[in-house]
Amino acid sequence: MMVMDAKIFEIADKLYAQQALTQDESHVLFDAIIKGDVDPILLSAVLTALKIKGETPAEIAGAASALLANANAFPSPEYDFADIVGTGGDGANTINISTTAAFVAAACGVKVAKHGNRGVSSKSGSSDLLDKFGINLAMTPENARGALDELGVCFLFAPEYHSGVRHAMPVRQTLKTRTIFNVLGPLINPARPKIELMGVYDQSLVRPIAETMVAMGMKRAAVVHGSGLDEVAIHGETLVAEIINGEIKEYTLTPADFGLETYPLEAIKGGEPEENRAIITDILTGKGTDAQQGAVAVNVALLLRLFGQEDLKANTQQAIAAMQSGKAYELVNKLAARG
């Protein structure tokens, strides 16, 4: 049996007593987890205790900071860039909206370093899709940074940067339930963007995740839940918690706020990675349906707001124009060509 630091048992005891950890305590715990220094049985107990108690913003921020501190380095640029990402796990199996939106946003002139992984609940996560487009998931950090500089978009595949997460995998797979790891992915982009649009699988997470981002020093961000989706919705209302200079502003958006009509959720259903590749190719070359195009455009529109373009209707039209011109699809091919 491995020898574990007494501090880890003290932290575990707090969790068993349903007491919240400080950000520092959470950092210490997750630092040990990522280094493989926590026995799987104890790991199972602390993840479950955290889940039943309910993870606080300080605990999530501490865990995220530990994972970032242990991540492989990425040469972050001085200029402003963003991530657009969902937790996944909403169970809706829609097309890959945030991945598609990353290319469209880049075609609109902003920079996006997207952090992602293979599918959790959908048949096709962002990495599954990019794989089908021939984009190299194992791109070196330097090559990815070059793509961000030159194309305005790059993709950082989580396992390439966060190898320590593997220590928690057997426990997560055995537990078969959501744990804190399900919300950590979008918060541990190794490029450390200061701007982020993050979708969450449950509306109860919107405010806590926004508070987590404030604790992590995020400059301008929005956390959204769209009527069951971890994206801005075109089939109903979207709850938004926007962060501006450390303050959180909560509001609701409808498709009309973007100048669009409402579409049924069925209109943006996805499939296997190969089917999704065909759908996304259509969307990025201006051949998608109005619903598909709209679903991507509203997410790009809110991301552009985080860069200071406040007019959502104008942003939506700009995003639609980037799809119809084929400019966004060119970026997919250029990223694939970098190898």
Swiss-Prot record:
Name of the protein this chain belongs to: Anthranilate phosphoribosyltransferase
Record-linked InterPro entries: Anthranilate_Pribosyl_Tfrase (IPR005940), Glycosyl_Trfase_fam3 (IPR000312), Glycosyl_Trfase_fam3_N_dom (IPR017459), Glycosyl_Trfase_fam3_N_dom_sf (IPR036320), Nuc_phospho_transferase (IPR035902)
Keywords (A to Z) from UniProt: Amino-acid biosynthesis, Aromatic amino acid biosynthesis, Glycosyltransferase, Magnesium, Metal-binding, Transferase, Tryptophan biosynthesis
Co-factor remark: Binds 2 magnesium ions per monomer.
Binding locations of anthranilate 1: 86, 117
Task of the protein: Catalyzes the transfer of the phosphoribosyl group of 5-phosphorylribose-1-pyrophosphate (PRPP) to anthranilate to yield N-(5'-phosphoribosyl)-anthranilate (PRA).
GO cellular component: cytosol
Highest taxon in the source lineage: Bacteria
Cofactor(s) needed by this chain: Mg(2+)
Similarity section: Belongs to the anthranilate phosphoribosyltransferase family.
GO biological process: L-tryptophan biosynthetic process
Catalysed reactions, as listed in the record: N-(5-phospho-beta-D-ribosyl)anthranilate + diphosphate = 5-phospho-alpha-D-ribose 1-diphosphate + anthranilate
Pfam families cross-referenced by the UniProt entry: Glycos_trans_3N, Glycos_transf_3
UniProt binding sites for Mg(2+) 1: 98, 231
Entry's Gene Ontology molecular function annotations: anthranilate phosphoribosyltransferase activity; magnesium ion binding
Gene: trpD
Residues reported in the UniProt entry to bind anthranilate 2: 172
Binding site residues for Mg(2+) 2: 230-231
Oligomeric and partner information: Homodimer.
Enzyme class: transferase
Matching NCBIfam families: trpD (TIGR01245)
